[in-house]
């Protein structure tokens, strides 16, 4: 039997809400990707060229994660949720993916965003989990349970 995990990073709580609902619909375990150094409001100020989120746009940046998923080997499908920052996933998602051997696993990205779509997000994440199979993913802002169920079914 296939076992699924919903892992997510949420700076403001929006992605957390979607992740919790998705885990329930998918019958999946839930894991929060917590940054070692929490983000402050100043860190998330998109207009500030020196804010942490702006500096972390560097594709080589790998913000530290505070905890690890001890039983990653148990999962066949890993849903990975995040807010879209600067048209891609925050680099903490790369940190998370690179911490595990995801060879043979299906990675299903999902995001929340104020206006962006997935764009090049999946392509940018694939290099962090070269042995995994990636789904196209989707932005799930305010998704109904029916949309979440369809998303799970399409990515089973």
Predicted feature descriptions by range:
Residues 26-28, 105, 132:
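A structural micro-motif
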């Amino acid at each position: 039997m296939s076992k699924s995990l919903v892992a997510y990073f949420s700076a403001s709580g929006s992605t957390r809400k979607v992740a919790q609902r998705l885990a329930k619909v998918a019958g999946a375990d839930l894991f929060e990707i917590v940054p070692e150094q929490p983000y402050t409001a100043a860190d998330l100020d998109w207009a500030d060229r020196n804010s942490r989120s702006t500096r972390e746009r560097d594709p080589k940046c790998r913000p530290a994660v505070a905890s690890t998923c001890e039983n990653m080997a148990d999962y066949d499908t890993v849903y990975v949720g995040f807010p879209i920052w600067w048209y891609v996933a925050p680099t903490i998602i790369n940190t998370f993916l690179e911490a595990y051997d995801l060879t043979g696993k299906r990675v299903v990205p999902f995001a929340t965003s104020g206006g962006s779509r997935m764009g090049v997000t999946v392509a940018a994440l694939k290099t962090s989990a070269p042995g995994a199979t990636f789904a196209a993913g989707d932005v799930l802002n305010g998704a109904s349970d029916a949309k979440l169920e369809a998303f799970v079914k399409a990515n089973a």
